[in-house]
């Protein structure tokens, strides 16, 4: 028990240091003009899994604090004010302080909580008598999500590629992944699905809650900042979710799975 607690504290300190380093170097954010695509949620997700939801929430708080600090000091994107109470207060008044604090912290704290329960829940499902059926169902959902991500990515990145071609490639990639995971991983190990879904859940928690909160709390100010009409904001936010969000989720799924397998041999994940 003592060794387990010590390992959790060491990992929490390590993940905290990684989050801080990633936040203030190019490693953590990918600037995409309208908003920063981030991979800082990955150590938060891993912390949630291997240190538990309480320490995961702390790591999420650190993530939120760094995004708030970076947005205030550095800026960098048109929408930096949504994470900075200082910039928001100067733009929309006192209410902006609370709105920006909510957006900067609440989604990120939940990134440190939700993946843990997703992982534990899926592990229990896959330990049931119908584990092969549930494994296949989850694999189908994962493959469809990946196919959609490839389709959106190709559609955004290549103007010369038709939508039909992008969709075909996406479906092909999704089908290949389904076959490989079904044939190689699921039948031999139940580790791949829980880790992958935990990664996706953490990434999408961040994207959906941040972008959803921006729409609810800052619709008009956000429209002015990025230079679009108010009625076009929903389309912009949907585009960010379907592009940034899907790409971030796929990257998170891969890294959480690969790193998670290694860490799980050192410190197995236990139910809290």
Regions found by a protein language model. Name each.
Residues 1-272:
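Loop-helix junctions at membrane interfaces
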């Amino acid at each position: 028990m003592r060794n387990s607690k010590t390992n959790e504290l060491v990992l929490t300190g390590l993940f905290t240091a990684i989050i801080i380093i990633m936040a203030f170097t190019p490693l953590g954010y990918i600037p995409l003009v309208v908003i920063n695509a981030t991979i800082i949620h990955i150590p938060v997700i891993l912390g949630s899994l291997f240190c538990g939801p309480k320490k995961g929430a702390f790591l999420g708080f650190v993530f939120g604090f760094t995004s708030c600090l970076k947005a205030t000091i550095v800026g960098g994107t048109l929408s930096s004010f949504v994470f900075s109470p200082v910039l928001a207060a100067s733009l929309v008044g006192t209410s902006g302080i609370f709105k920006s604090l909510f957006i900067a912290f609440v989604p990120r704290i939940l990134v440190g909580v939700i993946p843990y329960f997703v992982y534990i829940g899926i592990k229990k499902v896959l330990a049931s008598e119908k584990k092969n059926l549930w494994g296949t169902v989850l694999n189908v959902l994962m493959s469809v999500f990946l196919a959609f991500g490839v389709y959106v990515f190709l559609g955004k990145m290549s103007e010369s590629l038709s939508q039909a071609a992008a969709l075909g490639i996406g479906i092909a990639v999704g089908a290949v992944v389904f076959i490989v995971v079904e044939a190689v991983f699921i039948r031999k190990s139940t580790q791949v699905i829980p880790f992958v879904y935990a990664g996706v859940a953490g990434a999408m928690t961040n994207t959906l809650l941040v972008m959803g909160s921006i729409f609810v709390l800052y619709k008009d100010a956000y429209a002015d900042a990025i230079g679009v009409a108010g009625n076009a904001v929903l389309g912009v936010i949907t585009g960010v979710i379907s592009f940034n969000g899907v790409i971030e989720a796929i990257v998170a799924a891969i890294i959480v799975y690969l790193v998670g397998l290694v860490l799980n041999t050192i410190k197995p994940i236990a139910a809290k």
